[in-house]
Structure formats: C-alpha cells, structure tokens
C-alpha cells in the first residue's frame, strides 16, 4: 500500500508558532524598500505548499532529532525522473514542481550533495523574482534547510531578491551560498515556468561538479529531512527564531544598492538624468527589477516616477514574457522608435540579470554593448579607474569585445555559454568585464550578470561624454557613442535567430547532422562565396581549474572572420530552443549604417541551408530575431 503523508500541520499560510516559548522579533521595514504589491492568484496554500512523500513503506514519519524544541521529521520519498540540473539550475512548468515532493526532493538532493561544512550551522540566502509559486516554495526551502542543520537563512522581503542582489548579499554577508527562485526570462504563472538554482559562497552559480551530484542524488533519494516549524512571515523585515535556527527577512534593495554606489559615480549619473534635455525610461517588465527601479533611478538618481514603466512585480509578469529583446519588449521599442522618442531606454528581465539598451530609434546589440562598456569603463566608471584585469565573452557572442581587448592590450577569454565560466576567471583575478549575446552583461563586482549594472554603466558613459555639454548644445547620444566605437574598432554585424519550443527529437537530429558534417569538413571548403577556415564543436578548457567542457556549439568559421554557430539552449522548460548565430565583420565605415539583416542576408541564407533547419524542425521562421 502506497504511503502518502501530508505536512499540513506545519505548512500553513498564517504565521502561528506551535510553542509559546518561540521568540519572535519583527523590525520595521527599511525605508529603502519600495512600496509595491505582489499580485496574488487564487489558490489554497495548503494544497499548493503541501509536501507529500510517496513510498512503498507503510511507516509513518519519524522524528530524527529535536534540538532546542525543533522537531525534525524524516519523510520517506522516492526518486522522481527529470530533475537533471543545468547551467541555470532546474526549470520546469509550475505544474511539474507542484507534483508531490518534486521540489522537496531536489532541495534535499542538493543538501545531500554538499559537504556538511558548506551548510551545517551556516548562513544561506533565499530570494527570487516574485513569480507564481515562489511564496509556497520559499516556505518549503526554509523548512528543509532547517531540517538539514542550516543555522540561519536571509530572505528578501516578500521573497523578493533579484539574481544580482542574491550574489551581492552572499558576498557581503559572507554566506555559505544561496537559493534563487526564478526561471529568469521565461513566462510566469500557474501554466508557465518556475525554476530553482543554487549559488556558492563566492556568489556564483554552483559548478557542474555540484549540479551533477544533485542530479545523481535525485536518482537515489529516499528521505526528506524537514523541520516541523510553521510558515515564516516574509512580509515584514525582522528576525524569527526557532531554537538555534533563525530566519531574517531583509530589505532586498539595501545591500545591492550599497554595492552599486561603490562601483559608479551616482552624482555624475544624476547630473545627466536631471538635465531637462535628457529623457530616460526604464521598463521593468512587471518583473523583479521593478522593486529596485524606484529606489535606484528615482530616489537616488532623480529620474521622474513616470519614467519607470511596468514597475510593479507581478506573479505572472502582467501576462507578459519578461525577456528584454526587440520582440518581447515591443512596448519599449515602440516608445524609443517613435518620433521625438526618449534619449535613453532600457529594460530588464524576470530576475533582473539581463538588459536591453536603446537610444532614440537605435538598438544596441548585447555584443556591441559589452564592447562599448569595456572600451569606456576606465574613464567613465570609478570601479575600473585603476585597472581592468581582463575581458571575456561567451563563444556565440560577436568578436567586438575581442577587438577592444586587442587594442587595449588586455587579457581576453572566450568561454562557453553560462555565467559560471566567467566566475572562475573572476575568482582567479583574471577578469573584470564580460558579456553574452543573450542580453547578459556584468563585471566582477558580483558573480552574476547584472541588468541594472549594465544600465548604470551606459548612463555613466553617456554622462561622462556630456559632462561638458552646455544647456542648448546637442547631447552626445547612444547612437553617437556606438557609431564612434564602430569607426574605431570596426563593426561586427551580428544576429541571432531563435526557434523556441521545437520538438526535441528534430532539434537533436539537426545537431547530430551538423556534427557529422563537421567530420567531413576541412579548411578551404567553399560554402557559396565563403571559404572555410575551420569548423568544430566548441570545447573549452578552463585555465583556472583545468576542467574541460565539450559540445558547446557547432561553429563554422570562414576566412573573412564570418561565423555561423548552432546551439540548443538549456534554459527553457519545454521542448528545445534552437539558436542560430550569424556574424560578419565590416571594417569599412561607409558600410556601417547598413541594416544588420540586409548585411547578413547571404550568411543567414547559408546558415539555414547548411543546417537543413526547416527539414528537421518544420519551422518556417524564427520566434525571435535579435
């Protein structure tokens, strides 16, 4: 007879301590935290939050320890398929995570994968992007952490902490690590996506050595250790204690903002934003950045309140897709491309680690963005005034950054997609500024990409370029900065075609076909008017720890520097996303104003033809073009 035990007695929606001797201390909320309302969907907390354990055993849960009045229950469970943990943690549909023990198994498997000294009596951080299921998940994580001997957890108020903020808090508070509840730029809501990942003590995502162990332990897990404590009130800043275990609810903005103020010259940026001839707009996409936009851009930098759009974090992101690109941030694009549009526009994604930068009727590609930031950082950003240790990009990102590194004589690294590869270089003191073509940009101030950091970096550059511009004189614009950069370094025309939620079988067969093609390819082969320099499946050897990562993307590199790259993305929750990257370098300034899709058309046609993408996926056109 299958055993099913529901932990209804201590997973409840209200904060009701079981023991009269449990101390409770609630402090006043920090004034730095913005007033915002997280949208609530109708649900029964008891149903959604209950952890149910299924086992062939008919035994009841056993109390395995009761230190300082905390009862720890050992609940039988069994492995659940499909918990393979990737570069961005575990992402699935909400309904999958709501299956009995699905989340609890993964959290317990994580603790089973860590050395005890990495969490026993230690400090962990917990936060997320405010999406649907975060509130229930937070209570589950807190109780399992307590059950496994964690000493204290810091939780963002209302469970809110952006991914960059989690990294910042881990580093400032010297925590052992932290949980991030997010599916990043993927949609949220009962029918959409949820995700969880773990960051280590440096603030960077857990390495593959740990994520592989987590997956292995999900295949053999037999029990969940969970503390019999009530739900913790996450709506007020303060400390709640249960014996030797405590939960501190913190202002999600203050530590992160304090760090940013050491990186940038806020007075310089404020002098730009407060100019009557400069108009700024930021689209938070109803995601976590909305919790940071008002304290940073309005309260600190004097932007007008109406310059922040979609600034209230919602559990379903306002029925939107919180991915800052030309397709999903179309409202911002429309504003920026309108007649007499703002001078500067930006957007961030679900968990606040990605960004999109726009000028008046001008889109800055992420590849160009990181290159421009790197080229101007020493002059415009105080954090880099003494030195820039090195530059790095993900392999699919255009070579624009390479040219900056070469001109400035800086160390340069090309890594696989995944921020953890940058983190290793940063921890070794080899890297300062890095970026990915997937709208991720950042530096070694933390160990995650950082959307608001990128916005502030761009504002710093524009402010620096205009510090001597008098009222009435034409401001140096975003497009001016980029075009000047192209004139100095040349332009890397770049585009990415995304084919989302393809049938996995067809997508995998396409990659297999391309790998077979690699084995037959040789330098000098002609592909239309392009001559092959080399073709490979990208392999990376980490210069810090010597680890090797293979099969990171099929590359065709031609003698003129043009590239075609094919990858399957691991950040979605369903199906496969096929990504095709096309790049061509153009040194001729007279050709820099050509539309990228026109300049790249011959190479795009070649990319689709060589891969037989339509035959394998059935797709006539991409979901998103960047």
Swiss-Prot record:
GO molecular function, one term: magnesium ion binding
Binding site for Mg(2+): 184, 349, 351, 353
Modified residues (Phosphoserine): 184
Reaction catalysis annotation: alpha-D-glucose 1-phosphate = alpha-D-glucose 6-phosphate; O-phospho-L-seryl-[protein] + alpha-D-glucose 1-phosphate = alpha-D-glucose 1,6-bisphosphate + L-seryl-[protein]; alpha-D-glucose 1,6-bisphosphate + L-seryl-[protein] = O-phospho-L-seryl-[protein] + alpha-D-glucose 6-phosphate
Regulation: Inhibited by the Calvin cycle intermediates fructose-1,6-bisphosphate and ribulose-1,5-bisphosphate.
Domain of life: Eukaryota
Residue numbers annotated as active site: 184
Entry EC no(s): 5.4.2.2
Keyword Magnesium tagged: yes
Binding site residues for alpha-D-glucose 1,6-bisphosphate: 91, 184, 353-354, 417, 436, 438, 449
Cofactor binding note from Swiss-Prot or TrEMBL: Binds 1 Mg(2+) ion per subunit.
Key words of the record: Carbohydrate metabolism, Chloroplast, Glucose metabolism, Isomerase, Magnesium, Metal-binding, Phosphoprotein, Plastid, Transit peptide
Subcellular location: Plastid, Chloroplast
Cited CDD domains: PGM1 (cd03085)
PROSITE patterns assigned to the protein according to its UniProt record, in alphabetical order: PGM_PMM
Function: Catalyzes the reversible isomerization of alpha-D-glucose 1-phosphate to alpha-D-glucose 6-phosphate. The mechanism proceeds via the intermediate compound alpha-D-glucose 1,6-bisphosphate. This enzyme participates in both the breakdown and synthesis of glucose.
Assembly description: Monomer.
Record-stated family: Belongs to the phosphohexose mutase family.
Descriptive protein name: Phosphoglucomutase, chloroplastic
